[in-house]
Every structure is written in structure tokens, then in C-alpha cells.
Amino acid sequence: DLAGEIHGLSNVK
């Protein structure tokens, strides 16, 4: 879901 994508982007950072 969106939360998962947000976490993924934050994880990249």
C-alpha cells in the first residue's frame, strides 16, 4: 500500500 511505498523510499534514504 502507500504506507509500504513511503517506508521503502525512507529506507532508501
From Swiss-Prot:
Compartment annotation: Cytoplasm, Cytosol
Molecular function terms, GO-annotated: isocitrate dehydrogenase (NADP+) activity; magnesium ion binding
Keywords: Cytoplasm, NADP, Oxidoreductase, Tricarboxylic acid cycle
Reactions accelerated catalytically: D-threo-isocitrate + NADP(+) = 2-oxoglutarate + CO2 + NADPH
Gene Ontology terms describing biological process: 2-oxoglutarate metabolic process; isocitrate metabolic process; tricarboxylic acid cycle
Cofactor(s) this protein requires: Mg(2+); Mn(2+)
Domain of life: Eukaryota
EC numbers on record: 1.1.1.42
Assembly and binders: Homodimer.
Protein name (database record): Isocitrate dehydrogenase [NADP] cytoplasmic
Species in which this protein is naturally found: Sus scrofa (Pig)
Gene: IDH1
